[in-house]
């Protein structure tokens, strides 16, 4: 789970069952197909707007009032179509997000609340902290952002191939002279868009890669703080009886201090990244015009062609700059998916340990018609290996009463956990 590729693959292994689960797959594939179809529609509308942009500025340059009025009605049709498509796409996307989240939450809860694993998880897998927060918050972030990323990547790919052809045709050729070598570069604006987006993406990754770890740490600290508040509420009576308010306040103050430290680390990373992204945002509307300006000044294209070319360049550059625009969200998503995957890996370890043959494991056999509770060669040890009970032999008959006595920490409660089959 150390690379984005392995993180995506691990999360897909955990969460992709939604598209094959009985009772879910038909709706899942219908919603997915709807998103793809609406993505194609939106790109078609964007191409329609690009053509309208050319015609409008050409008519404006010619002061053709009749054509301008006609184009106003065309614009109304474009805006109306775009509004309907975006609204439907939003509805489909949100339904897919909530359905996927509900399925993954139910699967995780079922694995967590089975055979005492919710107890064993805290005892045997201490690195998996706050499973409740992972189920409630991290699954939500993982599924919602995954759907958003899938939608935006699809939109980028469709828009890229659509407007690459438009930009290639509009670019023409540019004569290049390097020393004594002269040649014509076809589709020069396409290469400019690719270079611009590639440089921006590399700089974004270099400045923002630390955000993934910072986001993971911050979410862990947020979960620790929530867990501390929940524990104080659940043990309110005991805290009051022991006059433990001061200790609880100190514990919560420490959690809040750790949260602030993690927040500050994340803020510094986001600040460094924003220096680049804000600069690129200011340059975004200007660079396409500068790149297309030589053809306009050379009289090869009219004003409408200049604006159409600039818009096509912006569309290609936007498609290639997905990482620049989404890196902060990607860092947040990566941190949440890691936490969800680690929870499932820990549950898998517990399931495999329960199924694997082990002579040292406590085996509980339930006999409904027996009047005896038998313990044979029962040994109970702490997770660190310290023995609490060694080879206990006990026979308890119905309705005998038994008192288990011993010092605190001697294993009285642990014996009951062993009998219940959760140790």
Model-derived regions: residue spans:
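Alpha-helical transmembrane segments
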Residues: 42-50, 85-97, 197-211, 241, ...
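Loop segments that connect adjacent transmembrane helices in multi-pass transporters
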Residues: 210, 214-267, 355-359
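Short intracellular "coupling" helices and adjacent cytoplasmic loop segments at the cytosolic face
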Residues: 63-66, 98, 108-135, 227-251, ...
């Amino acid at each position: 789970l150390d690379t984005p590729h392995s993180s995506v693959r691990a999360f897909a292994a955990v969460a992709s069952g939604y598209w094959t689960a009985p009772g879910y797959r038909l709706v899942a594939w219908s919603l997915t197909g709807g998103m793809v179809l609406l993505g194609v529609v939106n790109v078609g509308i964007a191409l329609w707007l690009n053509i309208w942009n050319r015609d409008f500025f050409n008519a404006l340059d010619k002061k053709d009032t009749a054509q301008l009025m006609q184009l106003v009605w065309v614009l109304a049709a474009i805006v109306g179509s775009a509004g309907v498509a975006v609204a439907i796409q939003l509805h489909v996307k949100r339904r897919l997000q909530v359905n996927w989240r509900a399925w993954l939450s139910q699967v995780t809860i079922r694995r967590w609340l089975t055979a005492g694993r919710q107890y064993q998880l805290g005892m045997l897998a201490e690195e998996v902290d706050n499973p409740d927060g992972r189920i409630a918050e991290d699954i939500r972030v993982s599924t919602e952002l995954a759907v958003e990323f899938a939608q935006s990547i699809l939109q980028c790919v469709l828009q890229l191939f659509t407007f690459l052809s438009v930009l290639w045709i509009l670019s023409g050729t540019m004569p290049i002279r390097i020393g004594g070598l002269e040649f014509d570069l076809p589709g020069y604006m396409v290469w400019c868009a690719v270079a611009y987006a590639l440089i921006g993406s590399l700089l974004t990754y270099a400045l923002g890669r630390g955000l993934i770890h910072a986001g993971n740490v911050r979410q862990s600290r947020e979960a620790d703080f929530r867990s501390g508040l929940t524990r104080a509420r659940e043990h309110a009576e005991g805290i009051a009886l022991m006059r433990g308010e001061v200790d609880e306040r100190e514990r919560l103050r420490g959690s809040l201090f750790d949260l602030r430290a993690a927040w500050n680390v994340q803020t510094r990373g986001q600040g460094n990244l924003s220096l680049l992204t804000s600069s690129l945002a200011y340059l975004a509307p200007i660079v396409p015009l500068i790149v297309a300006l030589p053809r306009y000044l050379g009289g090869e294209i009219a004003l409408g062609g200049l604006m159409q070319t600039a818009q096509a360049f912006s569309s290609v550059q936007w498609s290639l700059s997905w990482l620049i625009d989404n890196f902060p969200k990607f860092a947040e998503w990566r941190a949440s998916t890691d936490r969800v995957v680690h929870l499932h890996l820990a549950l898998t370890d517990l399931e495999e340990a329960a199924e694997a043959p082990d002579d040292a494991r406590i085996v509980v056999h339930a006999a409904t018609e027996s009047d005896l509770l038998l313990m044979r060669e029962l040994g109970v040890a702490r997770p660190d290996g310290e023995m609490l009970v060694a080879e206990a032999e006990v026979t308890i008959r119905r309705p005998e009463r038994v008192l288990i006595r011993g010092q605190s920490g001697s294993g009285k409660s642990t014996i009951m956990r062993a009998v219940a089959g959760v140790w």
